[in-house]
Amino acid sequence: LSAAVDDSVRLWDLRTPAAQGNMRIQGHPIVAYDPSGLVFGIALNERSSILLYDIRKFDQNPFITITIDDTAALSQIMMPPRIPVLTHLSFSNTGQYILAGTSGDVHYIADTYTGKVVYRLTGHIGLERADGASVGLVPKAGISGQEMCWTPDGRMVIAGSAAGQVHVWALPEHPPATLPATLHSTTTLQGQEGTPSVVAFNPRCAHMCTAGAQVAFWLPDLP
């Protein structure tokens, strides 16, 4: 599954050279598969929304549309409120949650079953303010896009910050009563030289990698 600068989303079979499906959808799409391979998501900046599709019905309408409306919280910071540029999309290990990362100072987690945004992740500094040339379709996104990921168990989100730290958010065991709930980073890791613009977690081992000007490997502190 791929998204292109011409606002197209294509479905590929690696055994053939031609795309098996081609969808035209305006809004600088960002795409991601869920772990089952049966559902995919498309994040659209121009609509501030995430569309969920059944892969078996590629050419039909999405079965869920998740709208990211953070006006109430963002209006306390700026007027008029502006949703940061969406730069990242990834599903949790169970497929229940989807992480919508932005270039700004907030990321979002939505429930794919209910279509509601359940968490706002704050405490970091967005990479739209980091040094470096833009790597995305929208220049004001800066170098944002790959600086966040889930842990393999789907219980934590890890993301880089323009200040050089790596932030960790732990998701509560039970969903909040009031949506969306704001989660501040529970842990901040130091040691990465420069801005960590890429963050990845080993799917099998307790081993994390971050990269920017240099590549850093992280292991847990064992008792």
In which residue ranges do the predicted regions lie?
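WD40-repeat beta-propeller superdomains and closely related acidic/aromatic-rich repeat-like regions
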Residues: 1-223
